[in-house]
């Protein structure tokens, strides 16, 4: 999946994906970001993993000292630079989320939302352990995935993307709740709350699992410095 997103849905195409969102999907996206902003408000340094064109960073930045976004696609960072041009407290870096070039305990909060745990196509344990490593003791770590309750709206969103020519047609026979398969090779899964809890437990952290808006599932962690 990480390879797919290095070749598809980059820059302006990624922005078009969000332009196609239905009212229910827009509600989901807004509720997810609002929860993030509430949790990181007042933090000095916040990192977003997989920042794309800057959609979440733009909402976070006014409420934090400095917002950092990393992405594996240079095209996304170019779009983000333009999208965030009015903000003076954002730093954008080309970086792999499982090999972060940051010192330990560098950030007050680390954020990975909208199913990045699956969409990045990387080792999930390494993704979580890197997020833990770069977050300071008592700092906040937020990961989110899709709630099963948003499945029907989620798959319809992908159908809309396919109709717009952004992705291949949805393979209806192979797509099941939690997993979307398209005919161009896209295969996108999701993680359950229990999976997120277990991933953080392996890194010595206790995750609070919480559903937001009946659309996203958050793992909310206050970083334990003993791990």
Task: Mark where each language-model region is.
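Short alpha-helix
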Residues: 184-203
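A short acidic, Gly/Pro-enriched loop at the edge of an enzyme's catalytic core
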Residues: 98-110
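A short glycine-rich, Lys/Arg-flanked "PGG" loop and its adjoining helix->strand segment in the class I
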Residues: 125-137
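Class I SAM-dependent methyltransferase SAM/SAH-binding core
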Residues: 55-99
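Conserved class I S-adenosyl-L-methionine
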Residues: 1-41, 55, 142-169
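A short SAM/SAH-binding and catalytic strip from SAM-dependent methyltransferases
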Residues: 109-123
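Class I SAM-dependent methyltransferase "Motif I" SAM/SAH-binding loop
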Residues: 50-52
């Amino acid at each position: 999946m990480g390879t797919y997103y290095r070749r598809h849905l980059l820059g302006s195409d990624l922005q078009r994906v969000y332009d196609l969102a239905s009212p229910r999907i827009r509600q989901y996206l807004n509720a997810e970001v609002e929860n993030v902003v509430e949790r990181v408000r007042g933090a000095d340094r916040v990192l977003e993993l997989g920042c794309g064109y800057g959609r979440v960073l733009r909402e976070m930045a006014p409420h934090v000292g400095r917002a950092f976004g990393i992405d594996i696609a240079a095209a996304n960072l170019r779009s983000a630079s333009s999208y965030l041009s009015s903000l003076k407290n954002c730093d954008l870096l080309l970086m792999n989320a499982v090999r972060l070039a940051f010192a330990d305990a560098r950030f007050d909060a680390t954020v990975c939302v909208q199913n990045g745990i699956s969409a990045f196509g990387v080792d999930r344990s390494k993704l979580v352990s890197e997020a833990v490593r770069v977050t300071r003791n008592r700092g906040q770590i937020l990961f989110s995935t899709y709630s099963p309750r948003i499945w029907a709206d989620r798959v319809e969103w992908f159908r809309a993307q396919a109709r717009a020519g952004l992705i291949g047609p949805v393979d209806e026979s192979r797509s099941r709740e939690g997993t979307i398969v398209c005919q161009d090779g896209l295969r996108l899964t999701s993680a359950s709350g229990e999976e997120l809890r277990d991933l953080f437990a392996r890194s010595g952290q206790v995750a609070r699992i919480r559903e937001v808006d009946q659309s996203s599932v958050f793992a909310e962690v206050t970083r334990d410095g003993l791990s």
